[in-house]
Amino acid sequence: MNKRAIISVYDKNGIVEFAKKLKEFGYDIISTGGTMKYLTENGIEVINISDVTRFPEILDGRVKTLHPNIHAGILAMKDNREHLETLKALDILPIDMVVVNLYPFKETIFKEDVTLDNVIENIDIGGPTMIRAAAKNFKYTTVIVDPEDYDIVAMEIEKNGEVSYETRFYLATKVFEYTSYYDSMIFNYFKHVRKDQSFSKHFTVPLELLQYLRYGENPHQKACFYKISLPFIETSNIVNCTQLHGKELSYNNILDSDSAIELLKEFDEPTCVAIKHNNPCAVASAENINEAYKKVYESDPISIFGGIVAFNRKVDKNVAEQLKKIFLEIVIAPEFDEDALSILCSKKDLRVLKLASLEKTDTFYDIKSVNGGALVQEKDRMLLADQLQVVTERKPSEKELEDLIFAWKVVKHVKSNAIVVAKDKMTLGIGTGQTNRIWAVEHAISRSRFDLKGAVLASDAFFPFSDSVEAAGKAGISAIIQPGGSIRDKDSIEMANRFNIAMVFTGMRHFRH
């Protein structure tokens, strides 16, 4: 008796060649609908699945493989006498191989103006049922969901007359990887359409491999880069950047680029951001990006070395010539003019990335792994909850207020405890990741290469004591923005008044860990 294979595929790459091989190996091929038509047109004899089920396709093809004659054939244990006797009694033949891939759900949800009805019709039911059944019974049944595995299976049959246990187990594992990914897309899409922002009892993310990385954060760590396969994720992200030049991105390059892009989204006016080790080392806004870059370089010409520089405007020849003078890992921008790209590409090891966009749309959750679990939260997209509250005797001037908002945007993206000192929409000093707030203040002040008279200071969380305000006052800081909310706010306000500092409360903090 010939072995039997069911073939029903949406992705028809390589299927004709593989089916011909199976026929050479003595397999009878059972098929459905479009696949049967395609194989027949290519000269391959197939058995209509309706001849096996002895039941017609119904409900516009929604029901065609969901039948005991199919699933009993797939699930029967071929060394179990009772199973074989049952098949014989019911006139059911065993099925030895299932070659199936699923309706294009992912491609459907990414189409513009797709309707929920279109999406629903592209949720496969029969396909997942067959491949899950075959995967469960992998000791006896071979299942293929990936065209890349056709050659492996064909070679083993040609060499050994059968597919090895190890390969069948490997292929079965791929089935559950495939169906879990498929179901995760459906779950997340339905949740999005329903505008359900609650945290689910079970949380899955449809991640698709984008790139194998040379190594992880350190050379002894293996790593990969995955993308989220959902259409409602912001397009302005590192995943959607186009690499125009340079070596492949490293794990750390990707992390730093992500930080740069997220910070850029805070600004509408021409802005330049320099990132090092996932923290901003300098940020500036100006009338054009030429001036913005000059301010960034002046702010911290040391830390920028070996860092990432990102812009929210087109990079021109003048900027590119300045960038070429120093060692940088990556330059990011929405556009590069021809001369600028030529200049940057003359640097062999410089990576040049083009942003897809900088628009803010719906986004996915912020997910952080911990040993044994994961923390899931909303992205910190809010800048200010309410209007600023002036709490000191002196109100900030219009210019101070502009600088305060600028500094507040930056401090939101600095590791806590975080302090940013700024003036003229340019960071003068950044206190990063200190274990107490006064150290963060002292760090930001000491790092500045400029006279801080008239500068402003932003703190990502409240001041627990007045010492931070005192240090700011002694350094010449004229205005402060902070969340407020400490039981000692009164002490900080009194200290600010003593130095004639204008201080405003935001009513919200921006911790970043």
Swiss-Prot record:
GO terms for cellular component: cytosol. The keyword Hydrolase applies. Signal peptide: none annotated. Keywords: Hydrolase, Multifunctional enzyme, Purine biosynthesis, Transferase. Residues 1-145 form the MGS-like domain. InterPro entries: AICAR_Tfase_dup_dom_sf, Cytidine_deaminase-like, MGS-like_dom, MGS-like_dom_sf, PurH-like. Pathway: Purine metabolism; IMP biosynthesis via de novo pathway; 5-formamido-1-(5-phospho-D-ribosyl)imidazole-4-carboxamide from 5-amino-1-(5-phospho-D-ribosyl)imidazole-4-carboxamide (10-formyl THF route): step 1/1; Purine metabolism; IMP biosynthesis via de novo pathway; IMP from 5-formamido-1-(5-phospho-D-ribosyl)imidazole-4-carboxamide: step 1/1. It comes from the Bacteria. GO terms for biological process: 'de novo' IMP biosynthetic process. GO terms for molecular function: IMP cyclohydrolase activity; phosphoribosylaminoimidazolecarboxamide formyltransferase activity. The keyword Membrane does not apply. It holds the Pfam family MGS. Its EC number is 2.1.2.3, 3.5.4.10. NCBIfam families: PRK00881.1, purH. HAMAP family: PurH. The IMP cyclohydrolase activity resides in the N-terminal region. This is Bifunctional purine biosynthesis protein PurH. It comes from Caldicellulosiruptor bescii (strain ATCC BAA-1888 / DSM 6725 / KCTC 15123 / Z-1320) (Anaerocellum thermophilum).
